[in-house]
Amino acid sequence: MSSLLLSFFTSLISILFVIRYQHLHSAWSADSDLSGPQKFHTASVPRIGGLGIFLALLVTGLAAWLQSLSYQRELLLLVLSALPAFLLGITEDLTKRIGAGIRLLGTAISAGIAGYFLNAWITRIGIAGIDQALAIQAISIGFTCFAVAGLANAYNIIDGFNGLASMIAIIALLAIAYVAFQVQDKMILYLAVVMVGAIAGFFIWNYPRGLIFLGDGGAYLIGFWVGVLTILLVSRNSLVSPWFAVLVNAYPIFETLFTIWRRMVHQGKNPGLPDGAHFHSLIYRRMIKWAYGSDLLPAQEALNNSKTSPYLWVISSISIIPAVLWWKRPFVLMLCALIFIAIYIALYRSVVRFKKPSWFK
């Protein structure tokens, strides 16, 4: 509990200072581009919320080390492992000059470091032929780095509205913490709760008023952390199905895969370029703006931005709740994954055609 509170208040207070003194750093830290296809804010806002989250993790880790608390070593190792992903992400936030490929490579390096020091490798996914391939160390290492980097990028993709990516990460981490508690894996429980505290400190300033954004540094850090913890939970506990890891991250994973398919196959475009057809973008444009109007004052527009996120929180819960209920039943989890995909596609098509179901209003 002490680590949770320390993480929360460190994040909360450090981000308060970032916001309070933004006039000193806004020339570098503020997101002033209001015209891009994925830009839905109406004023210049600092996008270095990830700095507060990282500081919270680092301070909590150092405090745990000084007090010789349990799992302080693992916490500090995970924080240090996250450095390449976080530093490249926040450098992009400050300079706008770090390409997506470099950020992905940095996150893959972070995954490799975490895998080496914490033995966080993907060795099974519950499919016989693939599990045999993953028994080969080089394949396991490569797949782990790819998966963690992909999930971190997925969190960056869904980070489009106030509170969206941060709350989905909190929900996913609480699911991980619950299953860790069920299997008595206190290390995973501790690492998940510490990150929940750090994100919660950021969330208070981000939602609903959007006083600060997560930024690439924050999104990659959170995605990396969630990815490594799901891998550790499965690899350390044979009772936990690998499909729990898939379902608990189903929304960001499928949003990314669906985006790649939509751009490459359906539209014939470069999948790496930003566009305005993400599910969260469509909900905002075709539901929120239609319901509340678009000719609003900046403060009202910021609140409208925030009204988008709860829809996606509910959608992500469609996969996370079954993951929590049936975390050791792989076939049920596979079926739930298919059901989630079907629901996602049906809802996406409905919103595109302005025919949203009544329960989605």
Where are these regions (language model features)?
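"…together with the soluble PPM/PP2C metallo-phosphatase catalytic core" -> "…together
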Residues: M1-L257
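Alpha-helical transmembrane segments and their immediate juxtamembrane interface regions
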Residues: S81-G99, P322-K361
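Cytosolic, membrane-interface loops and tails of multi-pass inner-membrane proteins
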Residues: R20-P46, F258-A302
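Extended hydrophobic-aromatic, low-complexity segments
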Residues: S238-W243, I260, G272-L273, S294, ...
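Membrane-interface starts of transmembrane alpha-helices
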Residues: G99-I102, I136, G215, Q300-Y311, ...
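Glycine-rich, flexible loop segments associated with nucleotide phosphate handling
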Residues: S44, L75-L76, A138, F244-A245, ...
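Membrane-helix cytosolic exit motif
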Residues: V18, F254-H266, N270, W327, ...
